[in-house]
């Protein structure tokens, strides 16, 4: 089942009729008499201040989010455990958040909750005996705004409850549709949360979902469900920092499908296209959605250009005549325009990548004329003008872009609500403060149930009221786990674009360059929109220089401050009439870029004598990255990692490798041994804090495997200084997930872990 938990011996018992509501066809599970001895604890636990408060918080949170239309993809799933402290005769509540549980039926969560009790060494009692150990699993259905709650006492006693988050009604009957919607909801949450560090909370457990058994039938089940639900993409929400509105390509459902395909074997991509082709035939009313998603899949696969171009022409030939034949007040027209502009953007991007700038400009111009508030169309138009050396028009195009939201209000509502959770977590800040806030009574309770004999040893893994054990050492590199992990804690949440919020204040105060510190604090949580526009500006700087860009700006624009100085009675000069008013956000960007360039220039002057801390090297590297000084940025980020393993610097370095083409000149400077070293260390750091999914790491490993081959990667790791059993088994597992030869057979696990009890069924059959 799940490698998150260890194993134990089991005694076979007689099958008994379940008192719960298992669906027909599910075989009653046999009894297990577990023993806690030698069973590793590999999940976190947060001790509640008041028993049951995490469940109360979830209820109020979902009610508020749903009533205000901000539920989005919903919060992570919740596991709540009730235990009895017999010495003080009181109930103690523990909980943690989790993604990746297969909630396609009740049997999967039941098996999971059973393992939690087994992992804690608790006796699974029969229905005739009093059971004070109650475990509850909660998961949110995005589509019907329902919270499915499974209350589990034993294999004989459990109850499934469905709560309408809008009105509190809990008498809703279970149905196959609800389970299917919940499964898709879990798919979306697993992918989106794993890809977005702002959404994560300390102690979040991220299981590898259907990847664990590396079974083609499991992969296909995800594809079938996600593709089937594509017409319901509007119900899933979208990231408003990347698009003004949801489209068939700008939504969390389609994003989840595309990301999922990026970490599965190639034959799964073929299967997805086949499924979508069948849906086009069987569901003609939504065929345009399926056709556009197929085109997007082909764009990402890199070896289907001819077929993609053919399909682009087919869909445009179908949709454009329909658009031109509709009256302007037709309600259907906005969706049709969105579909067409999505396709045109793919076409324009393809032409840009193939150096056909003239045709790309004509396509992008058509797209912006159809939809003036589509960011992607304006971005590609600006890029086309830059590449064709029409720099004045590029500036005008950038100025015409819709200024996207700094933050997504739906996501932010959930993040703000989870600040409640942060009362349970206290970052170590490089051991600069006491980060265990539990009472002696609570520590004694933990020592008893976790079988710790040394209180000081236990306190090293307690962060506030959250305990973070990882006893199996799966993915362990000792130097990472015993140093950076304990000093920094999990790197997640808002303002996690650099380490300022994760190191001691004393280390922050050692940063000598005040401008560097100021800009680093301002960019701890920078919007996606600003990052994209800066890329265009830095491309202009690389081509014509900063001073020439400033001169071009003054030729094209009049600044708002100067415009306000003009009296209304004054006649505008011919020169001013020919200029555009520079948008305020665009004007501010020039000031930010100027400050970053000043830092870059200063660093070049002080390069020979610079003596920086690890934090300063990171902040300088990220600043140089913002101004596209890639060679020096890479050098600074690597130096930061040498001073102290820095997962943020590591992520950026690996992202260079991931996003660059193999033929790129800068790409040739990357040593694959260095890339592999960084990747393995990042995997180890993140798996220490329960990220067993690691989409980004799988994407990097997939590219690395295409360059080296899996056997060379395995041999390099075995012969490396970190070739410890804990990490080598993780890499082997990830390579198996990506293997091109995994057609239909499910592969047995090869990791050196004890056998699971015979009564525990796999999560994915």
UniProtKB/Swiss-Prot annotation:
Keywords: Golgi apparatus, Membrane, Protein transport, Transport. One of its GO terms (cellular component) is trans-Golgi network transport vesicle. The keyword Transport applies. It is found in: Golgi apparatus, trans-Golgi network membrane. It is a peripheral membrane protein. Its main location: Golgi. One of its GO terms (biological process) is chitin biosynthetic process. Component of the CHS5/6 complex composed of the 4 CHAPS proteins BCH1, BCH2, BUD7, and CHS6 as well as at least CHS5 and GTP-bound ARF1. The complex interacts with the cargo protein CHS3. Present with 2540 molecules/cell in log phase SD medium. Member of the CHS5-ARF1P-binding proteins (CHAPS) which mediates export of specific cargo proteins, including chitin synthase CHS3. This is Protein BCH2. The gene is BCH2.
């Amino acid at each position: 089942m799940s490698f998150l938990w260890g194993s134990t011996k089991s005694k076979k018992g007689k099958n008994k009729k379940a008192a719960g509501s298992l669906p027909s066809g599910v075989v009653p599970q046999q009894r297990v008499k577990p023993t806690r001895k030698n069973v590793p604890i590999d999940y976190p636990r947060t001790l509640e201040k008041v028993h049951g408060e995490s469940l109360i918080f979830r209820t109020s949170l979902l009610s508020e989010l749903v009533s205000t239309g901000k539920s989005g993809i919903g919060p992570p799933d919740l596991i709540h455990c009730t235990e009895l402290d017999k010495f003080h005769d009181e109930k103690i509540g523990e909980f943690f958040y989790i993604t990746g549980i297969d909630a396609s039926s009740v049997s999967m969560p039941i098996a999971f909750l059973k393992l939690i009790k087994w992992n804690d060494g608790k006796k699974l009692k029969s229905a005739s005996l009093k059971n004070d150990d109650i475990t509850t699993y909660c998961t949110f259905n995005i589509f019907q705004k329902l919270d499915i709650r499974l209350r589990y006492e034993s294999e004989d006693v459990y109850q499934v409850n469905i709560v309408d988050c809008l009105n509190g009604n809990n008498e809703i009957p279970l149905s196959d549709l609800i389970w299917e919607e919940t499964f898709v909801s879990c798919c979306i949450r697993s992918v989106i949360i794993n890809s977005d560090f702002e959404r994560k909370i300390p102690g979040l457990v991220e299981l590898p979902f259907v990847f664990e058994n590396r079974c083609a039938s499991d992969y296909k089940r995800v594809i079938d469900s996600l593709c089937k639900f594509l017409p319901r993409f509007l119900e899933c929400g979208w990231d408003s920092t990347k698009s003004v509105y949801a489209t068939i390509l700008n939504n969390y459902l389609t994003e989840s499908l595309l990301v999922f395909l990026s970490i599965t074997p190639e034959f799964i991509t073929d299967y997805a296209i086949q499924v979508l082709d069948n849906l086009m035939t069987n569901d003609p009313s939504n065929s345009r959605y399926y056709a556009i998603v197929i085109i997007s899949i082909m764009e990402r696969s890199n070896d289907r250009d001819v077929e993609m171009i053919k399909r682009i022409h087919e869909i445009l030939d179908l949709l454009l005549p329909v658009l031109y034949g509709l009256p302007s007040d037709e309600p259907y027209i906005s969706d049709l325009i969105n579909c067409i502009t999505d396709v045109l953007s793919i076409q324009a991007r393809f032409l840009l990548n193939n150096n056909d700038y003239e045709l790309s400009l004509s396509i992008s111009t058509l797209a912006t004329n159809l939809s003036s508030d589509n960011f992607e169309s304006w971005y590609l138009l600006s890029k086309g003008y830059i590449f064709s050396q029409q720099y004045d028009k590029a500036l005008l195009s950038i100025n015409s872009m819709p200024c996207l939201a700094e933050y997504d209000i739906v996501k932010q509502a959930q993040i703000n609500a989870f600040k409640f959770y942060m009362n349970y977590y206290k970052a170590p800040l490089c051991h600069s403060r006491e980060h265990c806030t539990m009472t002696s009574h609570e520590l004694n309770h933990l020592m008893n149930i976790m079988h710790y004999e040394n209180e000081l040893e236990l306190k090293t893994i307690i962060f506030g009221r959250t305990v973070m054990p990882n006893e199996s050492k799966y993915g362990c590199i000792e130097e990472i786990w015993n140093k950076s992990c304990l000093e920094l804690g999990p790197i997640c949440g808002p303002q996690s674009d650099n380490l300022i919020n994760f190191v001691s204040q004393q280390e922050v105060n050692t940063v000598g360059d005040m401008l560097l510190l100021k800009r680093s604090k301002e960019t701890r949580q920078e919007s996606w929109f600003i990052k994209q526009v800066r890329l265009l500006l830095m491309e202009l700087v690389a081509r014509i220089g900063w001073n020439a860009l400033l001169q071009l700006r003054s030729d094209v624009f009049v600044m708002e401050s100067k415009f306000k100085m003009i009296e209304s009675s004054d006649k505008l000069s011919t020169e001013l009439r020919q200029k555009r008013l520079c948008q305020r956000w665009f004007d501010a960007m020039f000031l930010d870029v100027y400050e970053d360039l000043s830092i870059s220039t200063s660093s070049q002057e002080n390069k020979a004598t610079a003596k920086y801390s690890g934090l300063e090297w990171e902040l300088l590297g990220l600043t140089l990255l913002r101004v596209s000084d890639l060679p020096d940025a890479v050098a600074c980020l690597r130096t930061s990692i040498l001073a102290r393993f820095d997962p943020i610097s590591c992520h950026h370095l690996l992202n260079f490798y991931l996003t660059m083409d193999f033929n790129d000149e800068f790409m040739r400077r990357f040593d694959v041994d260095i890339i592999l070293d960084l990747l393995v260390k990042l995997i180890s750091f993140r798996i220490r804090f329960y990220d067993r999914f690691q989409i980004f790491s799988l994407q990097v490993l997939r590219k690395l495997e295409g360059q080296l081959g899996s056997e060379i990667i395995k041999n390099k790791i075995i012969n490396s200084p970190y070739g410890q059993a804990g990490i080598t088994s993780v890499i082997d597992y990830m390579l198996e997930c990506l293997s091109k030869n995994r057609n239909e057979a499910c592969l047995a696990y090869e990791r050196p872990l004890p056998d699971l009890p015979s009564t525990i069924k796999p999560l994915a059959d």
